[in-house]
Amino acid sequence: MQTQILERMESDVRTYSRSFPVVFTKARNARLTDEEGREYIDFLAGAGTLNYGHNNPHLKQALLDYIDSDGIVHGLDFWTAAKRDYLETLEEVILKPRGLDYKVHLPGPTGTNAVEAAIRLARVAKGRHNIVSFTNGFHGVTMGALATTGNRKFREATGGVPTQAASFMPFDGYLGSSTDTLDYFEKLLGDKSGGLDVPAAVIVETVQGEGGINVAGLEWLKRLESICRANDILLIIDDIQAGCGRTGKFFSFEHAGITPDIVTNSKSLSGYGLPFAHVLMRPELDKWKPGQYNGTFRGFNLAFATAAAAMRKYWSDDTFERDVQRKARIVEERFGKIAAWLSENGIEASERGRGLMRGIDVGSGDIADKITHQAFENGLIIETSGQDGEVVKCLCPLTIPDEDLVEGLDILETSTKQAFS
């Protein structure tokens, strides 16, 4: 295995190649193959970017057909047939069946582009600067998004430039299960001497992926929406990792029955791992002047083609949604079993998550690392999350075959016992 050029030339900022130090050559659905021919089951899926699996054949064919037709690849924000098809599909397959009416902003290819656009739009629309985000939240590493990201590791990497115009509130459960953290937020909003500038918007993940699979309760989300409405504050749902079916619904906020003012999507939005993001906004919030927020890659037509194909294939009825929820119950049960075994053997652990966005909190980054390293040796790719990397985190493809899902869970259970027997 030749890695010298990779180790010598790629920046030290790299991470995943340190955890999984092999050279991969190909992938299909939930399996990756390295250059020595060894297969691995993938419980990482591009950190939630490959909800429909690696090289999904249906989406691959849509991509090949589009390329073969000499379709527009790069067109800035020109009107193209691919864009029209994408917007029509988004409206007819996703938005209208859910009673949602949004305009679409295409800000650039990444999730952090979408977050930057969302928070800037909120400031323009409301004429206020402050944005409220939550403890353990992750929204990106460009300066505006970073200001709303809680993890100190990312916030320290600014060269001394301060992050500004954001205030942090405790996420659901941050102060224990008996405390409703929104009491504190609501108290500050009502106190003119509380020190909190009335925000333009609140940005929140319904399930915090990088923060440790912290799940916002449905009633908590409903109350958050009510507080925002009562105080003329926009509600932004960052659905970049939790969206596109990851929690069992296309939008993760559907479980709570709320209607955000602004939604950010990326990661699995293209369906094929192509860089793609959009911002959904209530029509009356579209305060942009032409060209006021732009980017060279703000309309990736290859991603339009695969995203539309994914929506038609998987979201035209509830068959796929029900299958994701069925698989989620399998993972939940097995994670609960693994957590129980750890607790019985002196390592306090608990299962958490929603849909196929699940984790096992083992209380220590060192313990979680031992489990994931052993799992990799046994042929499973799975990562950790949380402020100290203490949560073993599963983001397997939603399309994973049952036999691969069960085999991956078997590997994880065996690896856990091997690491601590």
Swiss-Prot record:
Pfam families per record: Aminotran_3
Entry note: thermal dependence: Optimum temperature is 25 degrees Celsius.
Keyword annotations from UniProtKB, A to Z: Aminotransferase, Pyridoxal phosphate, Transferase
pH dependence: Optimum pH is 8.6-8.7.
N6-(pyridoxal phosphate)lysine PTM positions: 267
Required co-factors: pyridoxal 5'-phosphate
Descriptive protein name: Diaminobutyrate--2-oxoglutarate transaminase
Native source organism of the sequence: Halomonas elongata (strain ATCC 33173 / DSM 2581 / NBRC 15536 / NCIMB 2198 / 1H9)
Gene name of the record: ectB
